[in-house]
A protein has these predicted regions:
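N-terminal glycine-/serine-/threonine-rich phosphate-binding loop
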Residues: 1-36
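Glycine-rich N-terminal segment of FAD-binding domains in flavoprotein oxidoreductases
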Residues: 28-53
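Glycine-rich beta-strand-to-loop/alpha-helix junction loops that act as flexible
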Residues: 38-43, 135-139, 192
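A glycine- and small-aliphatic-rich helix-loop capping segment at beta-alpha/alpha-beta transitions
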Residues: 49-59, 82, 86, 148-157, ...
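Ligand-binding beta-strand-loop-alpha-helix segment within the catalytic cores
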Residues: 59-134
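Class I SAM-dependent methyltransferase SAM-binding "motif I" and its flanking Rossmann-like core
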Residues: 132-179
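ATP/nucleoside-binding phosphotransfer catalytic cores, i.e., glycine-rich phosphate-binding loops
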Residues: 185-240
């Protein structure tokens, strides 16, 4: 695991954006595209802001999927698609056909999960291998749409529906699974502020308990893992 630490949120976000730009360039050089799964969370807004300001990203080569989604309209404030579109996708020249929403209002979440698998596997293989999965962590070490004791944690499918997820905002979700985290070429976990110290200690330091600590799925990663934190959180975790 590589720790990306900077003095404050803005600098840490800029550092994350720089590494994403590097990963994008390397993937495009190697495979002609950059495949990424993005999460919609306020914690990621400064990262998206820093990323969209960069001039060295070949946006037209990006293939965008989502790491998780709530069963809401894309106009709903809780929509991951809406959040990422507002803070990144609508502000950069990514082709609409290259952006794949995870859920459409009126669709059953179980059907949405099944429907999301085919385009992902067709483009990225089985299991799908993303160049990057970008996400954050919840207060109980939740990642993506995966909460403690969630059945999807042991799924052999890359995408699952989660009914009545207790992760705020509560409700049905569609999510990638640990299978995808394990196979990805790179994972980037972003967290700012000492309030995340407890959750990250559970992820990084506690004994293995993947079903009760979903974030521990990153321990099985076959690719690179980047932990992006600000100085306040780094000190709380004794990383500085």
């Amino acid at each position: 695991m590589k720790h990306l630490v900077a003095d404050d949120v803005a600098r840490a976000s800029a550092l994350a954006a720089s590494h994403i730009a590097d990963l994008s360039r390397d993937a495009i050089d190697a495979r002609g595209m950059f495949s990424v799964a993005l999460a919609g969370a306020p914690e990621l807004e400064p990262v998206y802001r820093a990323l969209r300001a960069r001039k060295d990203v070949d946006w037209k080569r990006w293939e965008v999927f989502f790491a998780e989604e709530r069963a809401v309209s894309t106009e709903d404030p809780d929509s991951a698609f809406g959040f990422v579109s507002q803070h990144l996708l609508a502000k950069v020249p990514i082709r609409e056909a290259k952006v794949r929403p995870m859920f459409s209002l009126g669709t059953d979440v179980a059907a949405a999960a099944v429907d999301y698998i085919d385009p992902m596997v067709s483009l990225l293989g089985d299991p799908p291998v993303f160049d990057l999965v970008l996400f954050t962590v919840g207060r109980n070490a939740e990642v993506l749409g995966l909460h403690p004791l969630c059945p999807a944690l042991s799924s052999v499918s890359p995408v699952e529906a989660v009914a009545d997820a207790p992760i705020p905002p509560e409700g049905d979700r569609v999510t990638l699974t640990p299978l995808v985290l394990r196979a990805a070429r790179a994972l980037m976990l972003v967290a700012f502020g000492p309030r995340h110290a407890r959750a990250l200690r559970m992820v990084l330091e506690d004994g293995d308990d993947r079903l009760r600590v979903p974030g521990q799925a990153i321990r099985d990663a076959q690719g690179e893992v980047f932990l992006v934190v600000d100085d306040a959180l780094a000190k709380a975790l004794d990383l500085r």
